[in-house]
């Protein structure tokens, strides 16, 4: 029976350890892939699939790429979601006995990329570790390119919702997980995430999530005795997730992770909570249509000059603060920068010269930093003293704190300046890295190399004089070394001591003993100098390993300063004002504007509006008006102004007082989720269920046209009861827009509900939208006028007008009945219920509705399912 060849046996032994990865197997100057890996790679990379004799009866499928061009191919595979294991020759083939030893030196995955050419400068590349048990969830994530590591645990209610919010917020490229077998909810959740999000998800070894093992991984990484010293509490589920994450990184990267030297353990009470719907509807970092940065809040506020600042401003926008003191510290810093245009300009000029210090430190830690990376580091730190000098008179506050955290790193600059050429070679293997004067032995070799060129020129001239051949020249190539070249027409003049080396079409090439002696001296010096340069560079890079924490601390301070500069620049450019943020429950905005819409409108055409909301007599603003009048823009504008204030930004208004807001909820638009089997109405109800279950008195609710996804009477009923529930049970500050003009009657019953409308000017049969929100209620929807503006044919418009008149006459009595009936049966009308005849349960025991209720398992029913069940029961009741 035929067996695999020794080399293929070696391949299979290594491949079996990395079954989930495509293995790039180093053979000389190529990386080769075999069997299934080869078929996958040839298809994905569009390269030729061949075959190789492997010792078996049939040949092994094979494809390969040159090692010097492998990065491009690897990057393409990783971007498609594949893992790639790099298997290198780990001993010199010239001294190997038998098969050259090989081993995997790194596994590259979507979440462990460090190649800056593949990473977005202003966006993190996160890898998530998820541990789900019956007790809750441990959630940790890392950006290996910067060393940032965070962890939390999610317990209690709304675990799945909080997880979805966190995952969608950080947008990881890879997720590893373990779900305890008995935790069915967790398994279903993972499958849902796999379907919805475009990330690489893989189940990881369960034993790496075990608490004792995970704890040891954390202790070893941070060189500590107890995990409590990092901030973990006993039995914190984040321990399981973090330990497994560290194990995964070490097992794939095959090296120490010295740049991961701190961990941020956070809770959900530190920042404003923004769920996935709110972030999408407010278009915080990208637009709903097109998924573009342009048109988002980030587009307006991002004036950052550094890559680190660009990543940080994205985080700030998605994580507004709840601590009033910290908010005001940011606002004071922004005010200082906004009020001093000269300071701001000088700061900008310094910031724009600074490279990505976070990712440079990551490359140093990984041992992948090139000579040019070190030059970029040197150039960056050269501007740090200038930044510190700008704020030398700053005595307190956030700016002073940041400047204290900026280390000028002058010793690092001096080291690189004295050792690395200003324009070094790209490759470590070609020399051209180390400056003269840094190493004595290298200096001697440099002299020999320079003298060697002079020796060659001198020999060439001597041979021309001796032979009389004016066209004679001395050349060099890597195969033959140095040679003397004589054209065919002068061959008869070649001396006898010339030794023929190569014959070409038009010339002959020779060597001489003297030339060979010179070659040995010159090439020996060059080869030795290249080897020493490489050793010296590695030594310098290793010296910088000990300074990574200093570089990272400085990078974080520079990034934060960059974001504050960005806020100040945006405030100055767009005429924003400093908001007042306090602990009250009042929102008072004068002449507020939508930060994005005003930017895209020409000639300052945006109409500003006031907003006043509290939790007492102006708690729910019932807003009516036609489509296109600006209701949605107005409501989003209020939400964005609150959010901007709580990230420490100035706001688009003439004044703004913001009572701290713990969550912003939005029920905006009709976003069908048909791929998940959810209709417009179901999505609407699910989002509303989330709001009523999680909102507090400190929350802001944006409710836009609830109930329009179903029939008129169903929709009106749901909108009516929802408004009542918000007003009575939640007490949340709410902007509630509707086309159901009947809802304006609620202001007569509830003190906290106030009616507002968007002004419209009628011009004969046309309508002009004034976009001004004032007290009162609209009496018409102007739907036909809007249809006319949209360009519907005149015949349709005329016919619609006739139908509308008929319908209005028929429904006026029915609508009056609904209004009177509903007003008499509000949630507060409990006295009516008490006076009704007491009914017995036996009267209904055999009804279909009671049978349906018996079937419901409350322990396994999610809020969304419950709302859907309630909706179905309501329909059955309506049919009785």
From Swiss-Prot:
GO cellular component: cytosol
Any one GO MF annotation of this record: ATP binding
Residues in the signal sequence: none
Record-linked Gene3D superfamilies: 1.10.1420.10, DNA repair protein MutS, domain I, MutS, connector domain, P-loop containing nucleotide triphosphate hydrolases
Keyword DNA damage: yes
UniProt-annotated binding residues for ATP: 625-632
InterPro entries, sorted: DNA_mismatch_repair_MutS, DNA_mismatch_repair_MutS-lik_N, DNA_mismatch_repair_MutS/MSH, DNA_mismatch_repair_MutS_C, DNA_mismatch_repair_MutS_clamp, DNA_mismatch_repair_MutS_core, DNA_mismatch_repair_MutS_N, DNA_mismatch_repair_MutS_sf
Coiled coil spans: none
Record family assignment: Belongs to the DNA mismatch repair MutS family.
Matches recorded under PANTHER family: DNA MISMATCH REPAIR PROTEIN MSH1, MITOCHONDRIAL, DNA MISMATCH REPAIR PROTEIN MUTS FAMILY MEMBER
HAMAP family registered for this protein in UniProt: MutS
Protein name: DNA mismatch repair protein MutS
Organism expressing this protein natively: Alkaliphilus oremlandii (strain OhILAs)
Taxon lineage: Bacteria, Bacillati, Bacillota, Clostridia, Peptostreptococcales
């Amino acid at each position: 029976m035929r067996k695999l060849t020794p080399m293929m046996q070696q391949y299979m032994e290594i491949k079996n350890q990395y079954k989930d990865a495509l293995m790039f197997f180093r053979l000389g100057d190529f990386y080769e892939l075999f069997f299934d890996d080869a078929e996958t790679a040839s298809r994905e990379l569009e390269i030729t699939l061949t075959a190789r004799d492997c010792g078996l009866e049939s040949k092994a499928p094979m494809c390969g790429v040159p090692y010097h061009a492998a990065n491009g191919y690897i990057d393409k595979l990783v971007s498609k979601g594949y893992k790639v294991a790099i298997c290198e020759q780990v001993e010199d083939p010239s001294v190997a006995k038998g098969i050259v030893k090989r081993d995997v030196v790194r596994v590259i995955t979507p979440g462990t990329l460090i190649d800056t050419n593949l990473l977005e400068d202003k966006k993190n590349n996160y890898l998530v570790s998820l541990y789900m048990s019956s007790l809750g969830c441990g959630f940790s994530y890392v950006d290996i390119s910067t060393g940032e590591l965070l962890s939390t645990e999610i317990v209690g209610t709304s675990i799945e919702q909080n997880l979805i919010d966190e995952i969608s917020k950080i947008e990881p490229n890879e997720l590893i997980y373990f779900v305890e077998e008995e935790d069915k909810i967790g398994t279903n959740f993972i499958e849902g995430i796999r379907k919805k999000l475009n990330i690489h998800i893989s189940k990881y070894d369960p034993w790496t999530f075990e608490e004792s093992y995970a704890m040891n991984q954390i202790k070893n990484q941070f060189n500590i005795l107890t995990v409590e010293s990092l901030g973990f509490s006993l039995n914190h589920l984040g321990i399981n997730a973090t330990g497994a994450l560290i194990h995964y990184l070490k097992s794939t990267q095959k090296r120490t992770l010295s740049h991961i030297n701190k961990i941020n353990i956070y809770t959900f009470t530190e920042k404003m909570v923004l769920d996935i719907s709110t972030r999408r509807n407010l278009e915080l970092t990208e637009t709903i249509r097109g998924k573009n940065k342009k048109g988002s809040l980030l587009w307006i506020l991002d004036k950052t000059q550094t890559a680190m600042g660009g990543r940080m401003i994205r985080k700030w926008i998605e994580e507004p603060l709840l601590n009033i003191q910290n908010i005001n510290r940011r606002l004071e810093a922004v005010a200082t920068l906004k009020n001093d245009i000269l300071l701001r300009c000088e700061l900008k000029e310094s910031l724009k010269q600074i490279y990505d210090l976070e990712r440079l430190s990551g490359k140093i830690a990984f041992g992948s930093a090139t000579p040019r990376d070190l030059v970029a580091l040197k150039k960056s730190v050269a501007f740090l003293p200038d930044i510190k000098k700008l704020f030398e008179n700053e005595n307190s506050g956030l700016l002073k704190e940041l400047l204290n955290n900026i280390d000028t790193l002058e010793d690092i600059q001096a080291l690189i300046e004295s050792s690395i050429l200003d324009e070094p070679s790209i490759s470590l293997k070609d020399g051209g890295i180390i400056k003269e004067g840094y190493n004595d032995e290298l200096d001697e070799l440099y002299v020999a190399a320079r003298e060697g060129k002079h020796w060659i020129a001198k020999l060439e001239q001597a041979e021309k004089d001796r032979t009389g051949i004016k066209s004679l020249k001395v050349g060099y190539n890597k195969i033959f070394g140095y040679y003397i070249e004589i054209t065919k027409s002068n061959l008869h003049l070649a001396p006898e001591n010339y030794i023929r080396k190569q014959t070409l079409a038009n010339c002959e090439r020779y060597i001489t003993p003297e030339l060979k002696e010179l070659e040995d001296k010159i090439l020996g010096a060059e080869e030795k100098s290249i080897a020493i340069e490489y050793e010296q560079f590695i030594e310098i890079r290793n010296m910088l390993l000990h300074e990574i924490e200093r570089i990272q601390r400085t990078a974080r301070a520079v990034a934060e300063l960059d974001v504050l500069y960005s806020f100040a620049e945006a405030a100055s450019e767009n005429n924003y004002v400093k908001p007042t943020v306090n602990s009250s429950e009042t929102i008072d905005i004068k002449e507020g504007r939508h930060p994005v819409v005003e930017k895209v409108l020409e000639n300052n055409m945006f109409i500003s509006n006031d907003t006043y909301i509290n939790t007492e007599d102006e708690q729910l603003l019932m807003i009516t008006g036609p489509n296109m009048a600006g209701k949605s823009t107005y409501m989003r504008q209020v939400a964005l102004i609150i959010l901007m204030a709580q990230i420490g930004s100035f706001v688009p208004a003439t004044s703004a007082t913001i009572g701290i807001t713990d969550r912003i909820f939005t029920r905006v638009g009709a976003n069908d989720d048909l791929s998940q089997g959810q209709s417009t109405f179901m999505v609407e109800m699910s989002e509303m269920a989330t709001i009523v279950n999680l909102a507090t008195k400190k929350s802001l609710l944006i409710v836009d046209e609830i109930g329009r996804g179903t029939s008129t009477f169903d929709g009106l009923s749901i909108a009516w009861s929802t408004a009542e529930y918000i007003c009575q049970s939640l007490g949340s500050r709410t902007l509630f827009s509707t086309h159901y003009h009947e809802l304006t009657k609620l202001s007569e019953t509830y003190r906290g509900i106030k009616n507002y409308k968007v002004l419209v000017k009628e011009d004969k049969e046309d309508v002009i939208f004034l976009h001004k929100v004032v007290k009162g209620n609209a009496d018409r929807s102007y739907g036909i006028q809007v249809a006319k503006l949209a360009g519907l044919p005149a015949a349709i418009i005329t016919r619609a007008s006739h139908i509308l008149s008929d319908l209005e006459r028929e429904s006026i009595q029915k609508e009056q009945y609904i209004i009177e009936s509903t007003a008499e049966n509000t949630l507060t009308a409990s006295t009516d219920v008490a006076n009704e005849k007491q009914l017995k349960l036996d009267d209904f025991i055999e009804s279909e509705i009671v049978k349906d209720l018996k079937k419901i398992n409350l322990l396994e029913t999610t809020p969304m399912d419950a709302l859907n069940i309630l909706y179905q029961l309501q329909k059955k009741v309506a049919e009785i």
